[in-house]
Amino acid sequence: MNAVQKKIKVLCVDDSALIRSLMTEIINSQPDMEVCATAPDPLVARELIKQHNPDVLTLDVEMPRMDGLDFLEKLMRLRPMPVVMVSSLTERGSEITLRALELGAVDFVTKPRVGIRDGMLDYSEKLADKVRAASRARVRQNPQPHAAAAAAAHGHAGAAAPLINNPLVSTEKLIIVGASTGGTEAIREVLTPLPPDAPAVLIAQHMPPGFTRSFAQRLNGLCRISVKEAEHGERVLPGHAYIAPGHAHLLLARSGANYIAHLSDEPPVNRHRPSVDVLFRSAAQHAGKNALGVILTGMGRDGAAGLLEMKKAGAYTFAQDEASCVVFGMPREAIAMGGVDDVAPLSDMSRRIMARLASMGDRVQRV
């Protein structure tokens, strides 16, 4: 590292001394970052933030004295800064984490498994990557509205859109979406305006097992389309969005005239499973001109090559613009590779998608 480069200063907040020690060890082992201080609870953290002015905060979601969400909400209102949440692999933990992302947290990691060395190298790399991305992220000062308020605003009020069971119903047009850091909120903003009869949406969001089901359930309460975690072999239907499970790649397949969701436990691609590239490439192969590709905020380059393949197969492609991205990594790579037809702000993405679909009319290409 160049001597003039400053290390990323990280403040770790966790009520477990063991977790604080382990996080400190991992972060301090990286050449470009260091733990400037640790805190056992948000009240201590508040004073340490004033003292050390950290670049990134890692924050446990559940702590004594002050709840992690309460602290995050106050922090993002009074002193917005990049926050990476540290969450347990429980249903409650995943729900709290998703709420934290709504409030403005940049990303999250699961808690390290104390005493288990297997997988620790991979965990260390992921934590370091997320801290680096957070240090460069655009932090939103104004948090998103609560889920209930957002649902009411979209006229859904938590009711799931009805499932379509008619065996003659098919979906020819498809919306294929990939995202990483900042993607949970970006996906919410893309999906909530879609009408109940929108084409099917397939989504690969970098997220660990245990979180995607809660993510899908949360979106299902906000959207006019049905949102669910994808299941292997199920038909892909209009008015539905299918989110790749955190443990598997999601691919588009065909069975006669129908599109089918296919799950694969093949090794990670671009260090991710689910991988955006895997989903995009399957869409290029099986949907061709019938698909729209959308790459949203995220670090790294996953999805860039696959989006180019979609474009070469005739799909129209979108990328989120830099100003509205939390991290402009994946869209930047896709644009640089020449795989993007239209660069759009997040606030206008759904409108542009629906306008493009309308321009396609009924001229569906058979593949």
From Swiss-Prot:
Disulfide bonds: none annotated. It comes from Burkholderia pseudomallei (strain K96243). The modification 4-aspartylphosphate is found at D60. One of its GO terms (biological process) is chemotaxis. NCBIfam families: PRK00742.1 (NF001965), PRK12555.1 (NF009206). Its EC number is 3.1.1.61, 3.5.1.44. Contains a C-terminal catalytic domain, and an N-terminal region which modulates catalytic activity. This is Protein-glutamate methylesterase/protein-glutamine glutaminase 1. Residues 168-360 form the CheB-type methylesterase domain. The active site is at S180, H206, D302. It comes from the Bacteria. InterPro entries: CheB-like, CheB_C, CheY-like_superfamily, Sig_transdc_resp-reg_Me-estase, Sig_transdc_resp-reg_receiver. One of its GO terms (molecular function) is protein-glutamate methylesterase activity. It is found in: Cytoplasm. Its main location: cytoplasm. The keyword Lyase does not apply. Phosphorylated by CheA. Phosphorylation of the N-terminal regulatory domain activates the methylesterase activity.
